[in-house]
Regions:
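A structured beta-alpha segment of the ubiquitous adenosine-cofactor-binding alpha/beta core
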Residues: 76, 80, 115, 185-204
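Short, structured coil segments at secondary-structure junctions
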Residues: 147, 202-203, 223, 290, ...
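C-terminal core of ALDH-fold dehydrogenases
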Residues: 33, 282, 331, 336-448
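Conserved small-residue-rich beta-alpha loop and adjacent elements
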Residues: 89, 93-173, 225-227
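ALDH superfamily catalytic-core signature
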Residues: 131-135, 139-150, 165, 169, ...
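N-terminal Rossmann-like NAD(P)+-binding subdomain of aldehyde/semialdehyde dehydrogenases
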Residues: 1-114, 143
Length: 449
């Protein structure tokens, strides 16, 4: 059985590798036509999707009754007509985005008729392992296709019926478009297949896990393949002593209440001691009216009646209507707390002092840092990136919400006319010019300047 799993997974990855080489040369019009075909098929097969999803939801609700699943997981699993339409529209929006491939990122003359170009290209074979949300399968497949990457998809067992059907729709819709290579998308389902996939670091170029912090940590700890993702979303809002307190209250409430289950919701509210007595009573009243369970440090509890916070609270991603509050001395104390306890995801400062804002924004270690705005804005769609494959808190390759650009890398292309390295070496070496210029790489043609 183990041999069969390894053989099957290896074969799927090999097929994806071969398809990736061909997909890298598929023109934008063909890739867009394939995406439009996916969107149309989703609408045409809506009833089938709803039936498959209903089976998943029914099984998940039984698991919920036994205490094995959470309500949040069941909620993320559900699809309806509105959601299916939004998925189709998302695919169309990906098609409408500018082509991320072939863009000349830089052009440099090394000498006459010797030009170096840095050009955006696909990564190759990307794998995604995700939990709960069946819409993630379509979203990631669409982004992979647009960016010229082959993709290996692994969804959670709780969405198995939905995932199988959605994969079938994606595969059949793109197979109907001339020029799209067969095998560019692969579906794996068994946990053993994931373990084997994570061993194939010579064949798979990138893994993108989406799920709980424990789930992402498991992926990171069990592969040598580069992993793009984040383990936690411990986000903070800092209310500075010079904040507009009315605005601060609205932002602080939005950052927690608008959608508490997502990774960009605030988990800890930091309040400058200069405004603690004037700010905390009002915002606590608002939180309590929204059903938020509050915890606070000793200084917070001197002002408002909330449960005591523990050290563990400062590093907890609640993912629910829960919030910790801490009173701090100043912006520097706030920065220290964030850097000691944050997850490098998203942080926000509320202040009318631009110098204090700059201090905070440049001093905290996070992929996104906001001034006078809710942490909930940390999202690829809201950033204008279109759909996203996830959020990366790493500092290499891609950071923050990752859209199409994050699924590309680059190659150096050198266009010459028979130049020899020997010409540029030794006592009479010809000097390089090393001049930057505006130009687009065209195969076999040097720039006309």
């Amino acid at each position: 059985m183990q041999h069969d799993v390894e053989h099957d997974t290896d074969a799927q990855v090999t097929d994806a590798q071969r398809a990736a080489l061909r997909l890298a040369n598929v023109d934008e019009a063909t890739r867009n036509a394939a995406l439009e075909s996916i969107a149309a098929a989703l609408r045409e097969r809506e009833a089938e999707i709803l039936d498959a999803n209903a089976a998943d939801v029914s099984a998940a609700e039984a698991m919920l009754d036994r205490g094995e699943y959470t309500q949040a997981l069941v909620d993320r699993l559900k699809l309806d007509e509105t959601k299916i339409e939004s998925i189709a529209e998302m695919v169309e929006s990906v098609a409408a985005q500018e082509d991320p491939l072939g863009e000349t990122l830089s052009a440099r003359e090394l000498d006459d008729d010797l030009e170096l170009y840095r050009v955006a290209v696909p990564i190759g074979v990307v794998a995604t392992v995700f939990e709960s949300r069946p819409d993630a399968l379509v979203q990631i497949a669409a982004l992979a296709l647009k960016s010229g990457n082959a993709v290996i998809l692994k969804g959670g067992s709780e969405a198995s019926e939905s995932n199988r059907l959605l994969y079938e729709i994606v595969r059949e819709a793109t197979a109907a478009v001339d020029g799209v290579p067969d095998g560019w998308a692969q579906l794996i389902e068994a946990h053993e297949e994931v373990d084997r996939l994570l061993e194939l670091d010579d064949e798979v170029d990138l893994v993108m896990p989406r799920g709980s912090s424990e789930f992402v940590s498991y992926i990171q700890d069990n592969t040598q393949i580069p992993v793009l993702g984040h383990t936690e979303g411990v986000c903070h809002v800092f209310v500075d002593g010079e904040a507009d307190l009315s605005m601060a209250e609205e932002v602080a409430v939005d950052a927690k209440v608008q959608y508490p289950a997502v990774c960009n919701a605030v988990e800890t509210l930091l309040v400058d001691e200069a405004v603690a007595e004037s700010f905390l009573p009002g915002v606590v009243e608002r939180y309590e009216a929204e059903g938020v369970e509050l915890r606070g440090d000793e200084r917070t509890r001197e002002v408002v009646d909330v449960d005591p916070a523990t050290e563990a609270d400062w590093r907890t991603e609640y993912g629910d209507l829960e919030l910790s509050i801490k009173v701090v001395e100043d912006v520097y104390a706030a920065m220290e707390h964030v850097n000691d306890n944050g997850s490098k995801h998203t942080e926000s400062i509320l202040t009318e002092n631009p110098e204090t804002a700059e201090t905070f924004m440049t001093g905290v270690d996070a992929a996104s840092v906001f001034h006078n705005a809710s942490t909930r804005f940390a999202d690829g769609y809201r950033y204008g990136l279109g759909a996203e494959v996830g959020i990366s808190t790493g500092k290499i390759h891609a950071r923050g919400p990752v859209g199409l650009e994050g699924l590309t890398t680059y190659k150096y292309y050198l266009e010459g006319d028979g130049q020899l390295v020997a010409t540029y070496a030794g006592e009479d070496a010809r000097p390089f010019t090393h001049r930057e210029f505006d130009g687009e790489w065209t195969p076999g043609r040097r720039s006309e300047r």
